Amino acid sequence: MNARRRGVWAVLLLAAGTAGAAPVLIDHRNVDVTRLTLPQIERAKASLHIAYGHTSHGSQLTDGMSGLVDFANGGGQGLALPENAFAWNQSGSDGALDLRDYALCDDVGYYPAWVDCTSNYLSDPAHSNVNVILWSWCGQMDDKYEAGTLTNEYLAPMAALERHFPHVAFVYMTGHVDIEDDADNKAACAAIRAWCATNDRILY
């Protein structure tokens, strides 16, 4: 892992409250925002430049982040941070986190389109400061697991992109609940989680 990627990982680790640990596996248990210090939040906003690709289900993440701004501004959980400490926008202007929502094509279920889109995006000089790529699933993850293509159409291409763009941190994601295909859905999530744990990756 090169120095630039280590630097990005360090910021993500601090933001996750798990400094010194690798891999970074974030789930529903990592929800105590009161553990974050203002210097950690400010460092993340100053250092992270994120491009996020998703369709409908992926908006839960950005909706939640917008809600977090209001939550913190209202002093939720006893927070006493400056106003809009968790603010984000498409450019990082006015001290906000640089999170380019819908920057990438569709979602990660569309292979090979998502791979080509990522490569083209990161190869564009206009995006040279982007150092985090985040892709969300819609409903295809369990289908890929059932078809035996989860590795070839998700895990392996992500690893290839990591090698091609070593200055970028790629955040892996599991999918949303799918009660109609619960077994394959859980198995796919477990496979992605195991891959990230074994290979020291970032998982959200």
PLM regions and their residue ranges:
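Oxyanion-hole/transition-state-stabilizing segment in secreted/luminal serine hydrolases
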Residues: 111-151, 175-178
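N-terminal signal peptide c-region/cleavage motif recognized by signal peptidases
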Residues: 16-18
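Bacterial N-terminal signal peptides that target proteins for export
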Residues: 1-9
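Structured segments of extracytoplasmic/periplasmic soluble domains
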Residues: 64-75, 157-164, 192-202
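Alpha-helical scaffolding within the catalytic cores
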Residues: 34-37, 112-124, 149-160, 187-192
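Loop/turn elements at helix/coil->beta-strand transitions in domains of secreted/extracellular proteins
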Residues: 46-49, 74-79, 127-133, 163-171, ...
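N-terminal carbohydrate-binding/catalytic regions of secreted carbohydrate-active enzymes
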Residues: 25-124
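Substrate-gating cap/lid alpha-helix
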Residues: 175-204
